[in-house]
């Protein structure tokens, strides 16, 4: 029994082992293999892949499964994957003729295509322009996206007359259907031309299409013409005045500038004819500014008799209608009224023709309205002669001072410029000694130079209280007769020598006191023994102030033997120095007054400046 039991135990163990092995084999046959698209085998295990739109951050292990994360913006994954990062979307560049057909997302990629008229070329992987079909060819429809155009010839009854990559062939126009006849048959490149059976006629309103434009054009031209005419008239009336005012302002500004520079400059210097014999040289006080005036009807004027006639003395009838050129004082108002006149140049004075010397110089009475022959002062250099200030002056060598061969009161008179009157009066010796007297004795004024000395002379016109003024205006602000006589008597030499002294002696005596009753002349004093200028402001550019010029009869222009050389004009630095004041020297005897004239100095001894038109 025992051996039989031992034999049964190994058999049981063998059967148990076979059962275990069978179970293990069944288990191995039931487990699926890792061949699916959603799984992958790792470390003897079959693990899951990541779904579309996610990427695998870490793979599976023996104890854990795979780890998946979503894609970022502009990234995608379109399938189950075991990728460690997502893919980027394509960029559809419009500069390369690309457009996005499908925008795409995290699970779908973006799709780009060429724009219309372009197609994708595999040669360059870029978009190219579609082929354009020539006339007679048409594009085959339907057009395919990203495909080049396919051109085909137009069939009969169809035409294509332009280059196009999209247009297909068009049919000809059916003229019969339109009720017209065919004028030209169509071709593959041109359409058929139809014509109406009725003759064509122009619309009746066609000319009216251009009529409004023509009317507008004519209206515009008329308005422009009228505006041009109005502008021309206004410019002629106002533009010239504005231009004249502008030029006047410029000239006035330049005159002031030049006047400031020349205020202390030289003055006009003039030499005149030397006189011979016992007759002394006549000297007078003359005004530089000249004006024209007409004699009043009751004025005494010269006759050919050479002396004052009865009509002059008695106040009888005078000649009517006779005009004369006058010399008068110029007030500030009169100068300003004439400020718009053209300023004469130096050449205009130099080129004037000379005038005859048989005419006299006259003065208007104060306050009379006058018109000056020139509105601006004359400028003369320091080395120039005063003769250019008065046109037509010549040296009269043979003439005598105060030679009364020409009449003093009435003469056959021819008008001439005032400056010529001034110079001719000086050159011919007609220098009335009552010219500067404030209250002259008219009994001595019209003294005929041909009468013997000592004889009584009838006045030219009468006293200033009862008649018009004589040739020289009274009230010029000059010293009285008695004061001038006393001053002249003190200045003459004690030895009773000839009254004619050299210029140096007269200049030395000129430093004495001013005449009694008159204040010394204010302003700049310039010149030498031959000429003296006095002004209270600008010398050559003045307004309202009177310039008195003292002219000596000693001339360097003639061939006189006794003439002294002309000195150079000197500008005095201060008002205290007046050594060159020529009017302060001893006076020459009056040749027209006889022996008494040799002893008595002349009345017009010193020039005095007037302070304006009011004192005249």
From Swiss-Prot:
Keyword set, alphabetical order: Cell membrane, Deafness, Disease variant, Disulfide bond, Glycoprotein, Membrane, Metal-binding, Osteopetrosis, Phosphoprotein, Receptor, Repeat, Signal, Sodium, Transmembrane, Transmembrane helix
Compositional bias annotation for Low complexity: 499-508
Signal peptide start and end residues: 1-29
Superkingdom: Eukaryota
Glycosylation sites: 105, 174
InterPro entries assigned to the protein according to its UniProt record, in alphabetical order: RANK_CRD_2 (IPR041648), TNFR/NGFR_Cys_rich_reg (IPR001368), TNFR_11 (IPR022323), TNFR_11A (IPR022361), TNFRSF11A (IPR053075), TNFRSF11A_N (IPR034040)
TNFR-Cys repeats (start-end): 34-68, 71-112, 114-151, 154-194
Cytoplasmic-side positions: 234-616
One Pfam family matching this protein: RANK_CRD_2
Chain spans, region Required for interaction with EEIG1 and osteoclast differentiation: 544-549
Function (record text): Receptor for TNFSF11/RANKL/TRANCE/OPGL; essential for RANKL-mediated osteoclastogenesis. Its interaction with EEIG1 promotes osteoclastogenesis via facilitating the transcription of NFATC1 and activation of PLCG2. Involved in the regulation of interactions between T-cells and dendritic cells.
Gene: TNFRSF11A
Region (Disordered): 468-536, 556-616
Annotated disulfide bonds: 34-46, 47-60, 50-68, 71-86, 92-112, 114-127, 124-126, 133-151, 154-169, 175-194
Positions of Na(+) binding: 133-134, 160
Protein's name in the database: Tumor necrosis factor receptor superfamily member 11A
Transmembrane segments: 213-233
Listed GO MF terms: cytokine binding; metal ion binding; signaling receptor activity; transmembrane signaling receptor activity; tumor necrosis factor receptor activity
Record carries keyword Amino-acid biosynthesis: no
Modified residues (Phosphoserine): 580
């Amino acid at each position: 029994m025992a051996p039989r039991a031992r034999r049964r135990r190994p058999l049981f163990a063998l059967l148990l082992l076979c059962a275990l092995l069978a179970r293990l084999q069944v288990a191995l046959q039931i487990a699926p293999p890792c061949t699916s698209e959603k799984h992958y085998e790792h470390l003897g295990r079959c693990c899951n892949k990541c779904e579309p739109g996610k990427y695998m951050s870490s793979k599976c292990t023996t104890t854990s499964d795979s780890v998946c994360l979503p894609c970022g913006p502009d990234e995608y994954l379109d399938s189950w994957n075991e990728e460690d990062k997502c893919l980027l979307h394509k960029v559809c560049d419009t500069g390369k003729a690309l457009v996005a057909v499908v925008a795409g997302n995290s699970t779908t990629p973006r799709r780009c295509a060429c724009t219309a008229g372009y197609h994708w070329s595999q040669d360059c992987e870029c978009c190219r322009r579609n082929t354009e079909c020539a006339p007679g060819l048409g594009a085959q429809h339907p057009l395919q996206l990203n495909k080049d155009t396919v051109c085909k010839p137009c069939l009969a009854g169809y035409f294509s007359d332009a280059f196009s990559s999209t247009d297909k062939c068009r049919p000809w126009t059916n003229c019969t259907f339109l009720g017209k006849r065919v004028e030209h048959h169509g071709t593959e490149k041109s359409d058929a031309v139809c014509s109406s059976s009725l003759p064509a006629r122009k619309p009746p309103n066609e000319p009216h299409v251009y009529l409004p434009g023509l009317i507008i054009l004519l209206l515009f031209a008329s308005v422009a013409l009228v505006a041009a005419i109005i502008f021309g008239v206004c410019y002629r009336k106002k533009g010239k005045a504005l231009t004249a005012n502008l030029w006047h302002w410029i000239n006035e500004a330049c005159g002031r500038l030049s006047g400031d520079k020349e205020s202390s400059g030289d003055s006009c210097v003039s030499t005149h004819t030397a006189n011979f014999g016992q007759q002394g040289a006549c000297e007078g006080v003359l005004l530089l500014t000249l004006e024209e005036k007409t004699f009043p009807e009751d004025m005494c004027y010269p006759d050919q008799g050479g002396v004052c006639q009865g009509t002059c003395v008695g106040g009888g009838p005078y000649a009517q209608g006779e005009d004369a050129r006058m010399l008068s004082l110029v007030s500030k108002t009169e100068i300003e009224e004439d400020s718009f006149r053209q300023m004469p140049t130096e050449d205009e004075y130099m080129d004037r023709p000379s005038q005859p010397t048989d005419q006299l110089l006259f003065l208007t009475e104060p306050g009379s309205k006058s018109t000056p022959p020139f509105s601006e002062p004359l400028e003369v250099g320091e080395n120039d002669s005063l003769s250019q200030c008065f046109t037509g002056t010549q040296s009269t060598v043979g003439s005598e001072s105060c030679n009364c061969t020409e009449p003093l009161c009435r003469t056959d008179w021819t008008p001439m410029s005032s400056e010529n009157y001034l110079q001719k009066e000086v050159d011919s010796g007609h220098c009335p000694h009552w010219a500067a007297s404030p209250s002259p004795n008219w009994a001595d004024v019209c003294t005929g130079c041909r009468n013997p000395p000592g004889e009584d002379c009838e006045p030219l016109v009468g006293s200033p209280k009862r008649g018009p003024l004589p040739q020289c205006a009274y009230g010029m602000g000059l010293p009285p007769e008695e004061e001038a006589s006393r001053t002249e008597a003190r200045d003459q030499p004690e030895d009773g020598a000839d009254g004619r002294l050299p210029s140096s002696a007269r200049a030395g005596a000129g430093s004495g006191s001013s005449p009694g009753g008159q204040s010394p002349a204010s302003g700049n004093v310039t010149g030498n023994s031959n000429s003296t200028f006095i002004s209270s402001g600008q010398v050559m550019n003045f307004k309202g102030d009177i310039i008195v010029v003292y002219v000596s009869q000693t001339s360097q222009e003639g061939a006189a033997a006794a003439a002294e050389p002309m000195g150079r004009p000197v500008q005095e630095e201060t008002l205290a120095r007046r050594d060159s004041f020529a009017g302060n020297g001893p006076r020459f005897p009056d040749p027209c007054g006889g022996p008494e004239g040799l002893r008595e100095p002349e009345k017009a001894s010193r020039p005095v400046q007037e302070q304006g038109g009011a004192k005249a």
